[in-house]
UniProtKB/Swiss-Prot annotation:
GO terms for biological process: tRNA 5'-leader removal. Residues 195-206 have a biased composition (Pro residues). It comes from Halorhodospira halophila (strain DSM 244 / SL1). InterPro entries: PIN-like_dom_sf, RNA_free_RNase_P. It catalyses: Endonucleolytic cleavage of RNA, removing 5'-extranucleotides from tRNA precursor. This is RNA-free ribonuclease P. It comes from the Bacteria. Its EC number is 3.1.26.5.
């Protein structure tokens, strides 16, 4: 039986949930209906599920969600991952810190040439710094939980997050394009894709 580990982006990123339904909560219901029939198991770490509950009102479908999706965090203290991956991660963080410092220095020089610090300069600094430091990298405990659980279970990771997908690929975790999740689930449920209802515009996720 195939296993999938889910990130919140499956239910919060429009490029992904529109494949199930235009309305966010109905999209979750459609997902659960497919999950019930698919020859597969679905998992989500506890902190990630809590994050989803903070973003979506799960009161009416919480019991059904927890029936179809196993809520389970990785066994962090009994896992091993290749040491080279950690060295690569540390090197990438160091590179990003240097990049962030250069951006800060550049904006500091621009600010020094002005009599006062323009608000748009502060906004630009924040945006560029965030882009340099966070894009395409694991930047939260929840992200790490998703990747580690997929690694532990030898499961397929489903996420539109570039950083998670990039790290997962480094350590050999199976991936599925989140835009294709509905089609994959229909195949595992034995549905005829030719008779499936529309599943959203063909836009890239992430």
């Amino acid at each position: 039986m195939r296993r999938f580990v889910l990130d919140t982006s499956v239910f919060t990123n429009p490029d992904v949930y529109l494949r199930f339904d235009e309305e966010p909560m109905q999209a979750i219901s459609v997902f659960l209906g497919l999950a019930r029939r698919a020859d597969a198991e679905f998992y989500m770490p506890g902190p990630v599920y809590q994050e989803l509950c903070n973003l979506r009102s799960m009161d009416l479908i919480g019991a059904e969600f927890e029936t179809e999706v196993y809520i389970r965090s990785p066994r962090r203290f009994s896992m091993t991952i290749p040491s080279e991956v950690l060295y690569e991660f540390i090197e990438e963080v160091r590179t990003r810190i240097q990049r962030g410092l250069r951006i800060a220095e550049e904006h500091a020089r621009q600010a020094g040439q002005a009599e006062s610090l323009p608000p748009e300069l502060i906004t630009q600094l924040r945006e560029r710094y965030r882009e340099a430091m966070r894009r395409g990298i694991l930047d939260s405990r929840e992200d790490i939980d998703v990747v580690l659980l997929a690694y532990e279970l030898d499961a397929t990771l489903v996420s539109a997050d570039e950083g998670m997908r990039k790290f997962a690929e480094r350590i050999g975790i199976k991936l599925v394009n989140p835009r294709y999740l509905r089609g994959v689930m229909q195949n595992l449920a034995g549905d005829d894709p030719g008779h499936a209802p529309p599943c959203g515009p063909d836009q890239p996720a992430g």
